[in-house]
Amino acid sequence: MDRLQRLMMSQRSNMIGAAATEMPLDDTKETVYISSLALLKMLKHSRAGVPMEVMGLMLGDFVDEYTVNVVDVFAMPQSGTGVSVEAVDDVFQAKMMDMLKQTGRDQMVVGWYHSHPGFGCWLSSVDVDTQRSFEQLNSRAVAVVVDPIQSVKGKVVIDAFRLISPATVVRNQEPRQTTSNVGLLNKPNIQSLIHGLNRHYYSLNIDYHKTSAELNMLMNLHKEQWQSGLKMHDYKEKERINLEATKKSVRIAEQYTKRIEEEKELTEDELKTRYVGKQDPKKHLSETAERVLEENIVSVLTAGVNSVAIK
């Protein structure tokens, strides 16, 4: 009985001590918003450094306790050979920040990014030390890891991390509190868990926001120019494309004929919903024919222009 009382008293004292040392925790709703410009610059810098690791700093603002806004990044003159990068060049950083302020970019450093070409998004022991030095300057600093090898068009392999406080681990508390159902955490992979995810650091939500100017920039990335029409295509390849387009047109024409026969037996109300959510054979046939005609007209004109120019 005495032993049970001593055990209950020790648990009570631990609870009182934990309550006395209670401190504000980060929230699982906290999201890192990365602009399109910053994301493109990170990917371009990371791809240029393959197979080496590269790093840079992120500029932005801490809007509130739930939002970290990244508007721009700039590369640092460092590279790594393994899973780590060298220390940050303070002189280069100071000069770069002064030059950016002259151009009107007066945001503060909200964290850093580096690449892991081909081996996923996680933090090595040296990366953890680098992140700890950033968090000594600002406790909300963010470490972003991007993998340029695994990233493909439409899906960027990227993740954001922040260290777990050792005091939280000692008190056996959760590193973050959950106050809303907003936000979606990605399911961690085995590789990240092996390298200390949710033990030494945790992952943050990432979202992307686009302004009207950035949206216009992205729409013009793969926009064809007037020189594209003067490019000659291989005649055998062009013949194969035309043959496939002709076979496709025949199939669509058969579907269109079948559609006309079916429409004779349908009521007016059934006709209105006949092709809702389905492919309209008439519209599809018209689009295919117009595209084939345009491509062949351009091809013939290009061949004529090139033959005259070569003479």
Curated annotation (Swiss-Prot):
This molecule's function is given as: Acts as a regulatory subunit of the 26 proteasome which is involved in the ATP-dependent degradation of ubiquitinated proteins.
Q: Pull one GO CC term from this UniProt entry.
A: cytosol
- Segments carrying motif JAMM motif: 114-127
Indicate yes or no for the key word Protein transport.
no
Name of the protein described by the UniProt record: 26S proteasome regulatory subunit RPN11
MPN domain location, by residue? 32-167
Keywords attached to this Swiss-Prot or TrEMBL record, sorted alphabetically, are:
Hydrolase, Metal-binding, Metalloprotease, Protease, Proteasome, Zinc
Quick one: which residues bind Zn(2+)? 114, 116, 127
Cite the GO molecular-function annotations of the record: metal ion binding; metal-dependent deubiquitinase activity; proteasome binding
The species is Eremothecium gossypii (strain ATCC 10895 / CBS 109.51 / FGSC 9923 / NRRL Y-1056)
Cite a single GO BP annotation.
protein deubiquitination
Which InterPro entries does the record match to this protein?
Answer: JAMM/MPN+_dom, JAMM_MPN+_peptidase_M67A, MPN, RPN11_C
Q: Which gene encodes it?
A: RPN11
> Which Pfam families is this protein grouped with?
JAB (PF01398), RPN11_C (PF23594)
Q: Which SMART domains match?
A: JAB_MPN (SM00232)
> What protein family is recorded?
Belongs to the peptidase M67A family.
